[in-house]
């Protein structure tokens, strides 16, 4: 599977995301729809963007009891999304249920990945707030291995952790990495970050880029810069 840049369309309403995407006249970028936009607009925004030719990563980070997640995934699978996710902290049983619910009668399904640790989480909060007294890379690798055991396609992680995850789970196990910023850009609320070129060198399969593209003076130029740096 080829590398790609996913634009995080973290907008509050439909008109904002459609206005943003209208600048991309020659491309149909892979886009991420998060909780804010999905909860505001519902399934209609997914259907509209699919109709316009975009691949969709639906980023809802499901984390509930296995049966609830399974039933929810049946609903999401019917939207013809291309990728979705759960929290790896929900246990192997929950992730297995998610995959089962996501799989259609013909055996096809979207890519299913698991969140290991949010890129806004650092080692200090991991230890003092979450009471996990292990190094961040060890925790992420453990969660990734659980996702692999559950039959998932990959994980969401920092670019800094892609190499270790591939070492533990194999190069075919996808790493989808937010926390990507240009070297001359602001870090924002991310703690574990890398540039697109760094992410490529570190082995990321997909990068998820939000504000460096959506808040750029020329989003199309910023997107092309990401593609050039990451895909080449």
Residues covered by each model-derived region:
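Hydrophobic faces of well-ordered beta-strands that scaffold small-molecule active sites
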Residues: 3-9, 31-33, 56-60, 84-86, ...
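Short, acidic/polar
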Residues: 12-24, 67-75, 134-146, 191-198
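Glycine-rich phosphate-binding active-site loops on the catalytic face of alpha/beta enzymes
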Residues: 79-92, 189-222
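Structural motif
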Residues: 26, 52, 79, 150, ...
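Active-site-adjacent beta->alpha loops and helix N-cap segments on the catalytic face
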Residues: 14-16, 37-52, 64-71, 88-111, ...
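Conserved anion-binding
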Residues: 2, 68-72, 77-153, 161, ...
